[in-house]
């Protein structure tokens, strides 16, 4: 029985890539800077001391980081016995965004340039805004700018509740984000508005990767909170991913846990499981792994590393999240059967010590574990698509156009 379990620690980069200068990210290192802060006692907030990731270390994380950066992460064990295969991978795609990273992991790098809304104020074309107001029968809109998602709620959340005007905002990513109150505006109404925005962006040729619904609750600035009902409307990948090939060619199954299905626009997904928060995502993943049959991929995105700690530049929170993940990792490893493979990876970096709030262009870890996987270094990989090609070979689908089999 062949099964693959893919765990994406969203934004868990392990050191700047060779082309990081193109992105202003030279020196970024999500893992390294978190470990450094922990070793200095600067991340003792509900947790304490050096970053403690013994299980990820056994799978080769510290070695992969050393391969990427040339140094051992502060306070971590560079001499631990490694029981998995490990690599550090460079991104071939032109961006450092979520869809590009995930699609490339599945064998389809993004070699075109996304469209972006580059102006920090008055970010969106008036023609687009006018169409959204008319089609969705809106009283107007707020925002129309670049912003952090939590900051803009404090700035405009109360006005939104009073006026019913949705909050439109963007970032350095190829996104159009819409924040609305779940109760006063309504979740269904927000989703409908996002569908309209997706249609207009596609028909208008803006080439925007995602429209993101950002529902929130609360009654005043300071206590607004985003809920777990986020919904991403992505464009479809430009070619069949290994997920699609497994389903189409082998009548296999692909189980999405968390936001995976949204990222792939539901292409190649046979089952969707929703969960919010690290523990809930872990629990849902364990349940699906126990039930998974032959020719199945269980694919989970642990978004909190990115959304809760990376973008918010919360080093202590990121460290605590990693340690929680590491404590629970043996539960996953125990479910890996004789012919199964477990792959732990990321989709980009988001160094919580870095300036600004955006992603960082970094190598990602590729940690592969299974009874038949030979432990040791798989070296530097030129593309995340090596993961997709490895899966294509493993399941016996037609080969991907990009990437090399690692096993």
Swiss-Prot record:
Enzyme Commission code: 5.4.2.7
Name of the protein: Phosphopentomutase
Positions contributing to Mn(2+) 2 binding: 306, 311, 359
Gene3D superfamilies noted in UniProt: Alkaline Phosphatase, subunit A, Phosphopentomutase
Organism: Salmonella typhimurium (strain LT2 / SGSC1412 / ATCC 700720)
Gene Ontology molecular functions: magnesium ion binding; manganese ion binding; phosphopentomutase activity
InterPro entries in the record: Alkaline_phosphatase_core_sf, DeoB, Metalloenzyme, Phosphopentomutase_DeoB_cap_sf
Keywords noted in UniProt: Cytoplasm, Isomerase, Manganese, Metal-binding
Cofactor, free-text remark: Binds 2 manganese ions.
Family per record: Belongs to the phosphopentomutase family.
Main location, first listed in the record: cytoplasm
Protein's pathway: Carbohydrate degradation; 2-deoxy-D-ribose 1-phosphate degradation; D-glyceraldehyde 3-phosphate and acetaldehyde from 2-deoxy-alpha-D-ribose 1-phosphate: step 1/2
GO biological process: 2-deoxyribose 1-phosphate catabolic process; 5-phosphoribose 1-diphosphate biosynthetic process; metabolic compound salvage; nucleotide metabolic process
Function comment: Isomerase that catalyzes the conversion of deoxy-ribose 1-phosphate (dRib-1-P) and ribose 1-phosphate (Rib-1-P) to deoxy-ribose 5-phosphate (dRib-5-P) and ribose 5-phosphate (Rib-5-P), respectively.
Cofactor requirement: Mn(2+)
GO CC entries: cytosol
One Pfam match: Metalloenzyme
Compartment(s) of residence: Cytoplasm
Residues that, per the record, bind Mn(2+) 1: 10, 347-348
Swiss-Prot/TrEMBL catalytic activity: 2-deoxy-alpha-D-ribose 1-phosphate = 2-deoxy-D-ribose 5-phosphate; alpha-D-ribose 1-phosphate = D-ribose 5-phosphate
């Amino acid at each position: 029985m062949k099964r693959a379990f893919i765990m994406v620690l969203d934004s868990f980069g392990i050191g700047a890539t060779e082309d990081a200068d193109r992105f202003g990210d030279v020196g970024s290192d999500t893992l390294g800077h978190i470990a450094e802060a922990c070793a200095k006692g600067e991340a003792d907030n509900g947790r304490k001391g050096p970053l403690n990731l013994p299980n990820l270390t056994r799978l080769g994380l510290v070695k992969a980081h050393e391969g990427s950066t040339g140094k051992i992460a502060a306070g971590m064990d560079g001499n631990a016995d490694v029981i998995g295969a490990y690599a550090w991978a460079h991104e071939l795609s032109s961006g450092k965004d979520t869809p590009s990273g995930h699609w490339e992991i599945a064998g389809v790098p993004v070699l075109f340039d996304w469209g972006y809304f580059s102006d920090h104020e008055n970010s969106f074309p008036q023609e687009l805004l006018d169409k959204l107001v008319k089609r969705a029968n809106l009283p107007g809109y707020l925002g129309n700018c670049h912003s952090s998602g939590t900051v803009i709620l404090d700035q405009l959340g109360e006005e939104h509740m009073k006026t019913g005007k949705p909050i439109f905002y963007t970032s350095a990513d190829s996104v159009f984000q819409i924040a609305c109150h779940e109760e006063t505006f309504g979740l269904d109404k927000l989703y409908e508005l996002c569908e309209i925005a997706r249609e207009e962006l596609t028909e208008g040729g803006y080439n925007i990767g995602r429209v993101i619904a950002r529902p929130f609750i609360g009654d005043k600035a300071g206590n607004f909170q985003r809920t777990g009902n986020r919904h991403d409307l992505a464009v479809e990948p430009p070619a069949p991913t290994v997920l699609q090939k497994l389903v189409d060619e082998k009548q296999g199954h692909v189980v999405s846990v968390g936001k995976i299905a949204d990222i792939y626009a539901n292409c190649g997904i046979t089952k969707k499981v929703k969960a919010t928060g690290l523990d809930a995502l872990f629990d849902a993943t364990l349940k699906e792994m126990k039930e998974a049959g032959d020719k199945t991929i269980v694919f989970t995105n642990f978004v909190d590393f990115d959304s809760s700690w990376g973008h918010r530049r919360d080093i202590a929170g990121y460290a605590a999240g990693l340690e929680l993940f590491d404590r629970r990792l043996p539960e996953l490893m125990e479910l890996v059967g004789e012919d199964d493979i477990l792959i732990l990876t990321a989709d980009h970096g988001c160094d919580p010590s870095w300036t600004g709030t955006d992603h960082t262009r970094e190598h990602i870890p590729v940690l592969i574990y299974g009874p038949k996987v030979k432990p040791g270094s798989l070296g530097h990989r030129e593309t995340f698509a090596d993961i997709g090609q490895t899966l294509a070979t493993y399941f016996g689908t037609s080969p991907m156009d990009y990437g090399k089999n690692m096993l």
